[in-house]
């Protein structure tokens, strides 16, 4: 999966392992947006197939979109208040153990806010990954880092500081 760099049409592309283009579609209905962005695949609807989840970088409203494999938009929701234009990073993974992946979003710039949404776009929980004084943005990953069978939320600072904070799926700081 690829999302174009800033300045290009916001077209999502899926490639086979051989490098052959499988499908492509616009991220939303505005081909004039020229921001960078993020795309992941995850099963956030509980169906038999994964969906594509997208968000834009800086300069665009903080909207997350969920598309089916054919590029049809299934859901769309604001991850943060509409005035926030600092960019939205995201990851997907089952962090509550129900068998359906959640959409975990973070601020690409500004305070290190993390929000966990259901696949329908309902806010489940929110927390800060680092102190409110840190304003450099974060990157996210989901993994079972302690081998207990449950996924954790990993947040790293988008800075020279190599610190990674690990949280339970319920947002409790682990280390």
Which residue ranges define each predicted feature?
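A short loop-to-beta-strand structural motif that recurs across blades of beta-propeller domains
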Residues: 11-13, 63-65, 113-115, 163-165
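Short glycine/acidic-enriched loop and turn motifs that connect beta-strands
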Residues: 5-9, 57-61, 109-111, 158-161
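Short loop/turn segments that connect beta-strands within beta-propeller blades
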Residues: 16-20, 68-72, 118-122, 168-172
């Amino acid at each position: 999966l690829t999302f174009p760099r800033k300045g290009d049409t916001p077209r999502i592309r899926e490639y086979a392992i051989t490098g052959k283009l499988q499908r492509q579609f616009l991220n939303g209905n505005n081909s004039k947006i020229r921001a960078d962005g993020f795309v992941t695949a995850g099963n956030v609807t509980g169906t038999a197939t994964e969906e594509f989840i997208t968000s834009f970088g800086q300069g665009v409203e903080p909207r997350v979109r969920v598309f089916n494999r054919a590029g049809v938009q299934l859901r769309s929701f604001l991850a943060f208040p509409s005035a926030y234009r600092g960019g939205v990073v995201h990851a997907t993974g089952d962090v509550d153990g129900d068998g359906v992946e959640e959409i975990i979003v973070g601020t690409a710039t500004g305070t290190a806010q993390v929000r966990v949404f259901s696949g329908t776009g309902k806010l489940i929980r929110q927390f800060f990954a680092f102190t409110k004084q840190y304003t450099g943005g974060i990157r996210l990953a989901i993994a079972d880092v302690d081998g207990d069978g449950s996924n954790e939320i990993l947040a790293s600072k988008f800075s020279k500081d190599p610190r990674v904070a690990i949280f339970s799926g319920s947002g409790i700081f682990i280390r």
